[in-house]
Design a protein with these regions (language model features):
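N-terminal secretory signal peptides that target proteins for export/translocation
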Residues: 1-12
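Non-catalytic macromolecular-recognition regions in eukaryotic signaling proteins
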Residues: 31-260
Length: 260
């Protein structure tokens, strides 16, 4: 079991703070803390029940998270053979088999390990219930208006755990830089998670593997790079298709101010 399930929250900063404190306790020699070798970078996978959308402070971005709560988790500590088998299959799917780093385990819980959802996405579509502009009538894709920003360790894993990313705000969009700041990433930090920073219309299925910055809160953000022609409320729907054909949809009300 992972810390995310214990807290049932989506605040990645809090998770990292708690994990850091617990790691410190392990270092000073708590009897109940043990270090166990995990063969894979991803130590825990979770099944999600749906998606939840939230607007950010700029009122032009949508943050996409798993809906509160999840059903099953699969990790390297799994005692149930069915869950252990699912975890091993997911690790093989991502060719994540030889990381072999030690993880802090306290009373059977891995508190500092990387957690991702058990499904990869295949495509994402954004629509509105109203006309956005003359080229984007109600119900038509807004993908070419939305910047997609996220992080993923898939490139690091695929490189044999060698390809790190040195973060610099000068090399990413302002939207990605805001997400990095929210996640507590500092300038020059060496990351195992690489950024995905492109227009949603240019995003491929390969960009949607193992989304998250070592946990799935948030999965990604979408920023509208242009404003609608008329001010008012729009019901914005995000539809996500998984690589197994499952579809998740979520809708949020956004109050736009028309552009010039």
């Amino acid at each position: 079991m992972h810390l995310t399930q214990l807290l049932m929250i989506n605040q990645s900063r809090l998770i990292k703070v708690v994990a850091g404190v617990l790691s410190l306790l392990c270092v000073v020699g708590c009897d109940f803390a043990k270090m166990k070798k995990c063969p894979s970078y991803v130590a825990t996978y979770i099944d999600i029940q749906g998606l939840k959308l939230e607007t950010t402070s700029d009122k032009m971005s949508v943050e996409v998270n798993p809906s509160q709560g999840f059903s099953n988790e699969y990790d390297f500590l799994a005692e149930d053979s069915k869950f252990a088998y699912k975890y091993e299959n997911l690790c093989r799917k991502h060719n994540d088999l030889s990381y072999n780093q030690k993880i802090s385990v306290i009373n059977g819980y891995d508190f500092t390990a990387q957690t991702f959802i058990s499904e990869d996405f295949d495509s994402i579509k954004v629509t509105s219930d109203k006309d956005y502009d003359e080229k984007h009538p109600a119900g038509e894709s807004l993908n070419d208006l939305c910047r997609f920003v996220a992080f993923s360790p898939y490139k690091f894993i695929s490189s044999g755990y060698k390809d790190y990313y040195n973060y610099s705000k000068d090399n990413v969009s302002k939207t990605l830089a805001k997400l990095a700041g929210y996640l507590g990433i500092s300038e020059g930090q060496k990351l195992t998670c690489h950024p995905i920073d492109k227009m949603l219309s240019d995003v491929t299925a390969k960009d949607l593997i193992l989304l998250g910055y070592d946990n799935p809160y948030p999965l990604f953000r979408l920023y509208f790079e242009s404003k609608p022609v008329v001010s008012g409320e729009h019901q914005i729907t995000v539809e996500v298709r998984t690589d197994e054909g499952k579809i998740y949809t979520a809708t949020i009300t956004m109050n736009f101010v028309a552009g010039n």
